[in-house]
Amino acid sequence: MSLADLRAALDAELAATPEYYDFKVLRSEREGALWRVTLEPGYVFAEGQPPGQAAALGLLDDSLDGASAWWGAPVKGHASVLALRLEEDQLLLQNASSAPPGPEQLIRLYPPRFLKALVEAAWDTPWAEAALALRPALSRPEAAPPGPALSGAPFRWLREAQRRALQTLPTQRCGYLWGPPGTGKTTTLGVLLAEYLDSRPTARILLVSATNQAVDQALIAVDKALQKGRREALRGALQRLGTRFDPAAYEGREHLLPGSDPALLATLSRVEAARPRSGDAQALKAWSDRLAGLREQQRADTRRALRQARLAAMTASRATAGLGLLRSLDERGAGEPPFDLLVFDEASQLSLAQTLLLMPLGAAALFAGDPQQLAPVLRSREPAAQRWLGRSAFADMPHQGPSVVLLDEQSRMAPPICALVSEVFYEGALKVATDALQTPEWLARRQRPLADLPAADHVIVRPVKGPGRWSAQDHGPQRPASAEAVVEAVALALESGTWQPRELVVLTPFRAQRALIRRGLEARGIAEAEGVRVSTVHRAQGSEAPVVFFDPVDAKLPFLQTQDARRLLNVALSRAQAKVLLYLSDADAASPLLAPLVQRLRLADDRRAVIPLQVLAAAPAFPRNALGLRVSAGRVTGEVQRLSPDGRQLWLVNERNGAALPLDAAFWRAKAGLAS
């Protein structure tokens, strides 16, 4: 893939990304110097797109973190988005020049255009060529120069794979820390980086991640590891860059936060929004000069913080937008990377293009995440955009070797849930941690009855009758029958008195179904504020709960036919600690997305004798004589589910992962003949 191909991909994605979104306001409430604005769920008009179903797909999401807000009524005003509460459809605004709009009025959001920063980097030909030259290192990593070994001695509780990550990944120029759900990926990363800083007194690290929340979690994990390892002197060398962090997460860890002048940030926001008319040349020149001065002052503050920090943490978007500043840290101008180690956390959510264009900043790179969970967000359908922006660096990850460490022990899911997730999504590599299985309290928390379900049942399919529909009110797909069933199940669990609201989570791929379920719970007197969380699956990564209720709504919808949907299903199932309930229609159960899971559950306890397929193939009635039987074909054991009309093919459902494997009848006849 060439530089021209990369540039074409970025241009295609830029063209597919709206300049602004208009949302309808439900209410605006003042909170001190801030404003909390609640939006009407599902109502959005995206610039350049017709209103309706297509526009409704461009809903409030992480791409609007850091957006600029503007409104024309009741009084024209502007503000910046300090934070998003996506599950509540809320914005938290700062530096508002007037009161935000009220009910039924519109607020316009201009998303940060980090894509423009990527385009600028791609058109910096020497930099872009240096970035593309690193592409082969992703799939064929080389050894890094020798350095101190990381022992992890202060952390005796590390599991085997976690300890292997410390020992091998720092020895590679490109390393992959693959952390499936519940395996302690963030904790492992925190320990690894704490050990790295301690063993290399002059080393500098840049830590980037996909979202502000992920940056906060990773940085705090490093700080905790330094604290637990009694390396207090190093804690002051960690620095969070950016203004959109969660202050509550840093209680007791204020030393991590930036020292930027709040007054400078507020002034900068006001000046940026006060651009004069283009016809007034003198006013425009004065405005431009003042803005340039303020931005230079801000850059100086940031540059000072970066030079003082040994580990700087920020979002990948901020790193991309500030690429020039980060490059300037190569103070000798020798073209050397300014950081010894560049860490991409939640790397599966960062595009290959963005990753490569940041990689020259580090002498070595470490990718932490899970390619079987959420992928980069992509709007363009152009093939070039799919190649560069729809995939992450994990697409080039080697299958094995010292550069890849799979954390294979998890302590979240009960064994049957873990087995299902492991076989369907991780080829059987994921297992329950030995220390968890040896802990009676851990086992007891995962052996609890739920209404009519015994404690020993962990994965349950609830049949659903009733069609789905498109909701004009909620701007998305809904299925009333499954919503009612979920509401009833939650109500019964709470009425039993053995479950607390915070222990129950409802997940669905669609916001419209989320809204319908929320209204159903409210009608039963169950308010979400009391603890029962109803969420889209997209927002659930990183969370967990004892019980998960999953409602796919309609598996025939185009979105649920994609590879992204498979990743969402993994996220949904792997949030559950004790039980996961799936609400499926017959059509859902037969869909490409869910059929393997349903078949795996059906065959999991099959105790029938296994007949070698080769034996059946020797009979004249083959392959009809194999239909419905439990057979073995090579290393695969399962049930012959169906035959082709002409009898030339048969499909064997693998009882380990539920996948249907096509087999050639003539091949097996020949194999049986040779054996005889």
Predicted regions and their residues:
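Pre-ATPase regulatory/linker segments immediately N-terminal to the P-loop/RecA-like helicase/translocase core
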Residues: 1-164, 235, 241, 246-274
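SH3/SH3-like beta-barrel fold
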Residues: 93-95, 650-655
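Conserved P-loop NTPase mechanochemical-coupling segment
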Residues: 273-315
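Intrinsically disordered, low-complexity, charged/polar segments
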Residues: 657-676
